[in-house]
Swiss-Prot record:
Function noted in UniProt: Plays a role in pre-mRNA splicing by facilitating excision of a subset of introns. Required for the splicing of CDCA5/Sororin, a regulator of sister chromatid cohesion. Involved in the regulation of innate immune response. Acts as a negative regulator of Toll-like receptor, interferon-regulatory factor (IRF) and canonical NF-kappa-B signaling pathways. Contributes to the regulation of transcriptional activation of NF-kappa-B target genes in response to endogenous pro-inflammatory stimuli.
Disulfide-bonded cysteines: none
Transmembrane regions: none
Superkingdom of the source species: Eukaryota
Positions of modified residues (Phosphotyrosine): 559
Biased composition, class Acidic residues, residue ranges: 525-536
Chief place of localization: nucleus
Protein's name according to its UniProt entry: Splicing factor Cactin
Primary gene name: CACTIN
Family: Belongs to the CACTIN family.
């Protein structure tokens, strides 16, 4: 039993080993068959490649022969086998190659080719052209050789590459083709690396063309073929590309225009800043001028005034209607030293720069006079030290005569003398003492400046006197009276040379006296004659005036006032009823009886009450809005009048998030209007029981503002103001007040503040 089982197991084992050996031999035979089949496929592939290379080489040789390059055949490529077992081809291939070479040789040595080759030297024009053709042929051969080598390397690389490398090469080639296609389609760089398998859109057909059949059917072009659709899409893409270019060009043009506008705005801003800077400079100069005047006032008040302070006070008194200076400005130089006058010249220059030419003539004349006084003082100092070594232009004996000639002359007369001296200096001459005449000219300039200041001082005094008489109601003569000129007799007419006396010469001793006599005698005669004529005219005129005045007083000698009509009243006249006048009189008597300031009127009390509690953030607000076309029924009984008012506007800073971010307490934000306080004065209301009212109306021209109108009743007209249109705060805790007491209507309110809440 055990023997049978062992024999069965052995036989089963032998059968199993036999099956395994058979299966192993079958597998080995299958693998060997696959290897042989692969080898045969490779050999067939290599054979096809050799044939294709031979065909390409034959075609290239034929092209060489056609181009005339038969002297040298192109190099034959040496093709290598992949396995490297044998370097020679089969007999059939060798015979085919020999036959091809024989055929090419026969073609190359044909009579036509020899004739063309023999005729080609005859066609060559020059050795230089032949050398150029030879170099061109050599460069062409070099390019062909390089291309053949590159092709050989590519073929060799393809022959030895593995299937994975081949697959990678084809994929790279395909990707390059797709990339070129995407570039042609106008894809950007960010979408250039997307593929069907690698894209963030999850689209497996990303690179494929999407065909929207429904849209094509709707457009009626579903019958078109794929090629026609592609052409149509290309045209659409080209149109889109052109449109994008136009849009880009327009965008660039807009950016250019924007840059130009910004540049223009910058230039305008610079001009505004320049104007602002100019205004700031003017304000700064004005500030320094005011400070200089303030310092002058302080020094004058403390009794330590400088000459420039007195001159500044004099020139500022010309603009003042009440201040009067009785002395000429050059009298302030009396008693000054040379150092004081030099300081005065510097101060005058400062005032001329600060005033910017306002009183340039005055300061220029004062400079001339000061320089003349300085030169005189220096001459005195030099003469006090010892005898002068050089001649001073005018002799001391002649100087007094010159001063007497210049003294008492008007500015116009001195100007005539000045022109005559200048003409004499320009004319010149051999016996002309130039130093004398130049010194005389310098003195004459100082006398002209004094005469101009004297005439200006007289004009200012005359104008001040005229204004004072007008204010006091005193009748006076006109400021510029019309003088009646009487015809002069021939005996009293002056000759031209006597009208302008000539100053004495440097060498004449009796010249000054003669000139003075010649110039003074006719003048005195004329003066006497004029005085007599004027005295007679004034006497006649005064008598006529007295007679006319007495007649007027006789006609107007009434002690009761004349009754006036309504048309004769001025527009701003206030008409009072007898009862109202009596009431005012009694009120005035009561005010005199009570203790206190009797001169304080009801309006003063009103303004004093209205100004109480006025803070720093409040300012007076008196801009009234005109009301036109308003007619009152009581206008025929009472004369309408405007009420008095004292309004205040409350301004302040609003520290919201924006202002807290961009401003601080040192650089605060701009102030805004936060409220108003209206105080309207109605002391003479006819109906004391009617309370004044206010009406808030919309502003027609601007929605940001509103019209606040107050209505009280006779005899007061309505009054309106333009305010900011914001919501009011009606709570008394926030300062709202609307009351009428003691003839004063008060309306105080603040605007609501909108706070940011999350």
């Amino acid at each position: 039993m055990g023997r049978d089982t062992r024999s069965r197991s052995r036989s089963a084992g032998r059968r199993g080993r036999r099956r395994q050996s058979q299966s192993g031999s079958r597998s080995r035979s299958r693998s060997h068959g696959r290897r042989n089949r692969r080898r045969r496929e490779d050999e067939g592939r290599r054979r096809r490649r050799r044939r294709s290379r031979e065909r390409r080489s034959d075609s290239e040789e034929e092209r060489w022969q056609r181009s005339g390059m038969r002297s040298r055949s192109p190099p034959r490529p040496k093709w290598h086998s992949r396995d490297g077992s044998s370097q020679s081809d089969s007999g059939e291939e060798q015979s085919r190659g020999q036959w091809a070479r024989r055929r090419r040789r026969a073609r190359s040595w044909s009579p036509s080719s020899s004739a063309s080759s023999s005729a080609s030297p005859g066609r060559s024009q020059s050795p230089r052209a032949a050398a150029a053709a030879l170099s061109q042929q050599q460069s062409l051969q070099e390019r062909l050789r390089l291309r053949e080598e590159r092709k050989q390397q590519e073929e060799l690389m393809k022959a030895f590459e593995t299937p994975e490398e081949k697959r990678a090469r084809r994929l790279a080639k395909k990707e390059a083709k797709e990339r070129k296609k995407r570039e042609k389609m106008g894809w950007g760089e960010e979408y250039m690396g997307y593929t069907n398998t690698d894209n963030p859109f999850g689209d497996n057909n990303l690179l494929g063309t999407f065909i929207w059949n429904k849209a094509l059917e709707k457009k009626g072009i579903s019958h078109l073929e794929e090629k026609e659709l592609k052409e149509r899409n290309k045209r659409i893409q080209e149109d889109n590309r052109l449109e994008l270019q136009k849009v880009k060009q327009l965008r660039l043009e807009r950016e250019r225009e924007k840059a130009m506008r910004e540049q223009e705005l910058e230039m305008l801003q610079r001009e505004k800043e320049a104007e602002h800077f100019k205004t700031w400079e003017e304000q700064e100069d004005n500030f320094h001028l005011q400070q200089a005047k303030l310092r002058s006032k302080i020094r004058i008040r403390d009794g330590r005034a400088k000459p420039i302070d007195l001159l500044a006070k004099y020139i500022s008194a010309e603009d003042d209607d009440l201040a009067v200076e009785m002395h000429e400005p050059y009298t302030f130089l009396n008693g000054l030293t040379v150092a004081d006058m030099e300081d005065l010249l510097e101060d005058i220059q400062v005032y001329m720069e600060l005033e910017q030419g306002k009183n340039a003539d005055f300061w220029r004349d004062m400079t001339t006079i000061t320089e003349d006084e300085i030169s005189k003082l220096r001459k005195l100092e030099a003469s006090g030290k010892g005898p002068g070594e050089r001649r001073e232009g005018v002799n001391a004996s002649v100087s007094s005569d010159v001063q007497s000639v210049f003294k008492g002359k008007t500015y116009n007369q001195l100007q005539v003398i000045f022109q005559g001296i200048e003409g004499k200096i320009r004319a010149g001459g051999p016996n002309l003492d130039m130093g004398y005449w130049e010194s005389l000219l310098q003195q004459l300039r100082a006398h002209m400046a004094r005469a101009r200041l004297r005439e200006r001082h007289q004009d200012v005094l005359r104008q001040k006197l005229y204004k004072l008489k007008q204010e006091q109601g005193v009748e006076s003569e006109p400021l510029f009276p019309i003088l009646k000129q009487e015809p002069q007799s021939p005996s009293r007419s002056l000759e031209p040379e006597d009208a302008a006396p000539t100053p004495p010469g440097p060498s004449s001793e009796g010249g000054p006296a003669e000139a003075e006599v010649d110039g003074a005698t006719p003048t005195e005669g004329d003066g006497d004659g004029d005085g007599e004529g004027e005295g007679e005219g004034e006497a006649v005129l005064m008598e006529e005036d007295l007679i006319q005045q007495s007649l007027d007083d006789y006609d107007a000698g009434r002690y009761s006032p004349r009754l006036l009509t309504a048309h004769e009243l001025p527009l701003d006249a206030h008409v009072l009823e007898p009862d109202e006048d009596l009431q005012r009189l009694q009120l005035s008597r009561q005010q005199l009886q009570v203790t206190g300031d009797a001169s304080e009127s009801a309006e003063d009390i009103f303004f004093r009450r209205a100004k109480e509690g006025m803070g720093q953030d409040e300012a007076q607000f008196s801009v009234e809005m005109p009301l036109t076309g308003k007619a009152y029924l009581w206008a025929d009984k009472y004369r309408p009048r405007k009420p008095r008012f004292f309004n205040r506007v409350h301004t302040g800073f609003e520290w919201n998030k924006y202002n807290q971010t961009h401003y601080d307490f040192d650089n605060p934000p701009p102030k805004i209007v936060q409220g108003y306080k209206f105080n309207i004065f109605y002391p003479d209301l006819i109906d004391k029981r009617s309370t004044p009212e206010y009406f808030l109306e919309a502003c027609a021209d601007n929605k940001d503002f509103a019209i606040l109108r107050f209505h009280a009743g006779p005899p007061y007209e309505d009054i309106a103001f333009k305010i900011v249109n914001r919501e009011w705060e009606y709570s008394h805790r926030h300062g709202f007040r609307c009351q009428f007491a003691n003839g004063i209507f008060q309306l105080w309110f603040h605007f609501k503040r909108y706070r940011y809440r999350r």
